[in-house]
């Protein structure tokens, strides 16, 4: 069925049909409501679903309103409502905005370093909680505990040097009286000599590790090293700490296990 023209009411055939403003028009009937100038789809302007030319398009006029106390109150109330809504939207969206950062190797290295620092801090807090409060001594028990743990591993390294001094300057037959002389001079420390001798043998050929990060000593019983340094005579203390010697500097002490890798 062919529709009727919105202006003349006659049937509009497809060859002369204009579909605009939700209505159907003849091309000749699609003109300005005021001056009757024929319009097309490029130069018409619609107002209340009626076509107008640019010159006769109805202009919107504004009425001046006096600033009465009631109008001022309504204006202030509208501004307050807008401000409340703005704050409400701000609080809802607070903390949600974030920017996507590319996962580069540098960021991965920084993230891994931060995780390792957090692991070290957790280890320190664990040592503090294990010792418990100690009155007015403050942080002294923590330092003493770290020194005790390092001194527990140090005797194999400290008692190892005296052994080579006796080996090249004496024959095996002459070396037999040495443990007896130590026993006579120290008495109760007699068992320490054979234990030290047994542990000193594998100490020189201990495990070797390579540093994968730079580390600065946070305590006097720790050692500092740089990325690529070789750590020798390494001994495992626990899951988080090791004891060894930095081959480049010759310093011996505790070091974090997650800063090195086995060679």
Swiss-Prot record:
Nebulin repeats lie at residues 61-95, 97-131. The modification N6-succinyllysine is found at residue 112. Residues 204-263 form the SH3 domain. The modification Phosphoserine is found at residues 99, 118, 134, 146. Residues 5-56 form the LIM zinc-binding domain. The modification Phosphothreonine is found at residues 68, 104. This is LIM and SH3 domain protein 1. Plays an important role in the regulation of dynamic actin-based, cytoskeletal activities. Agonist-dependent changes in LASP1 phosphorylation may also serve to regulate actin-associated ion transport activities, not only in the parietal cell but also in certain other F-actin-rich secretory epithelial cell types. GO terms for biological process: monoatomic ion transport. The modification N6-methyllysine is found at residue 75. One of its GO terms (cellular component) is focal adhesion. Residues 168-186 have a biased composition (Low complexity).
């Amino acid at each position: 069925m062919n529709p009727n023209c919105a202006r003349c009411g006659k049937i509009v055939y497809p060859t002369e049909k204009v579909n605009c403003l939700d209505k159907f028009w003849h091309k000749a009937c699609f003109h300005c409501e005021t001056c009757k100038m024929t319009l097309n789809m490029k130069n018409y302007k619609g107002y209340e679903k009626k076509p107008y030319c640019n010159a006769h398009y109805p202009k919107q006029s504004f009425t001046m309103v006096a600033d009465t106390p009631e109008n001022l109150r309504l204006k202030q109330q509208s501004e307050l409502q807008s401000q409340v809504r703005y704050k409400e939207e701000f609080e809802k969206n607070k903390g949600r905005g974030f920017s996507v950062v590319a996962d580069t190797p540098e960021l991965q290295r920084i993230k891994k370093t931060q995780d390792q620092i957090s692991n070290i801090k957790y280890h320190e807090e664990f040592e503090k909680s294990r010792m418990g409060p100690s009155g007015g001594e403050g942080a002294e028990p923590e330092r003493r505990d770290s020194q005790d743990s390092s001194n527990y591993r140090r005797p194999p390294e400290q008692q190892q040097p005296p052994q080579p001094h006796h080996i090249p300057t004496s024959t095996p037959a002459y070396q037999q009286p040495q443990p007896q002389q130590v026993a006579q001079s120290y008495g109760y420390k007699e068992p320490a000599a054979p234990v030290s001798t047994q542990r000193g043998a594998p100490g020189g050929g201990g495990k070797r590790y390579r540093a994968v990060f730079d580390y600065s000593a946070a305590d006097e019983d720790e050692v500092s090293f740089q990325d690529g340094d070789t750590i020798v005579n390494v001994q495992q203390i626990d899951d988080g700490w090791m004891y060894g010697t930095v081959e480049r500097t010759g310093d011996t002490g505790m070091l974090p296990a997650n800063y090195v890798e086995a060679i």
